């Protein structure tokens, strides 16, 4: 259940727990898989299944500074693509973040068909070596015009020192972001329409779930690692829950 501050619209309270993924075994939970490849040419990272390790209490996605196929870094990417997707509901990622300039952690929802329309919901991103600032965002990649809506909040706790819950509620016409059960931002279809922006989040296509740890290029948001960035760097996922 989320706490909504004054000024927030009432979010739908989804009560049926439809997925309860615990990353506490020797293998990824059924429905999750590790992928190989790049991020469509973005970032300085080649993702490899070998960079995903089960610790017994979490899935550890580790970035290393070892070149592969023209990319200077390797790291881990896991998703439910092809196994589970959702149109509306609440998603809760319980995770522990790495610390370091150039590290770009992501907990997000993507649509399988990158044609028309195509949207992306970022539940959590953390970068710039700042483990107190959480970013949540929406992206419309098609139809044109492309647009992004960025929200953020500052955590009192250091996200690299323990596990926290990063949450999003997707309901018809509205997206709500939260950390540890406290909502910090909302964005609505009405706001998008007023700004002349398409809204691909109600088309019924469904979104699958992704967790990845990328390493940024110098020209990208957050910038590249520097001499203070320690490798290997690890993001841990303990659980993912979905209510509908």
Q: Can you annotate each of these PLM segments?
A:
Residues 2-244:
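GH16 jelly-roll
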């Amino acid at each position: 259940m989320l706490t909504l501050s004054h000024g927030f619209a009432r979010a739908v309270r989804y009560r049926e727990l439809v997925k309860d993924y615990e990353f506490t075994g020797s293998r990824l939970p059924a429905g999750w898989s590790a992928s190989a490849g790049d991020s469509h040419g973005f970032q300085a990272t080649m993702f490899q299944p070998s960079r995903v390790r089960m610790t017994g209490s979490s899935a550890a996605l580790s970035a290393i500074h070892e070149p592969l196929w023209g990319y200077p870094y390797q790291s881990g990417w896991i998703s439910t693509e092809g196994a589970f997707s959702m149109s509306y509901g609440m998603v809760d990622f319980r995770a522990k973040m790495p610390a370091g300039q150039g590290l770009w952690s992501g907990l997000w929802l993507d649509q399988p068909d990158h044609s028309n329309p195509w949207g992306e919901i970022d539940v959590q991103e953390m970068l710039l070596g700042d483990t107190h600032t959480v970013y949540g965002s929406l992206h419309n990649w098609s139809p044109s015009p492309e647009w992004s809506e960025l929200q953020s909040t500052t955590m009192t706790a250091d996200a690299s020192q323990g596990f926290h819950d990063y949450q999003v509620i997707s309901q018809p016409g509205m997206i709500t972001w939260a950390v540890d059960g406290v909502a910090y931002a909302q964005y609505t279809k009405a706001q998008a329409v007023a700004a002349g922006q398409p809204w691909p989040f109600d088309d019924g296509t469904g979104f699958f779930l992704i967790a990845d740890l990328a390493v940024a290029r110098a020209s990208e948001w957050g910038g590249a690692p520097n001499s203070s960035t320690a490798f290997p760097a690890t993001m841990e996922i303990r659980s993912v829950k979905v209510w509908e």
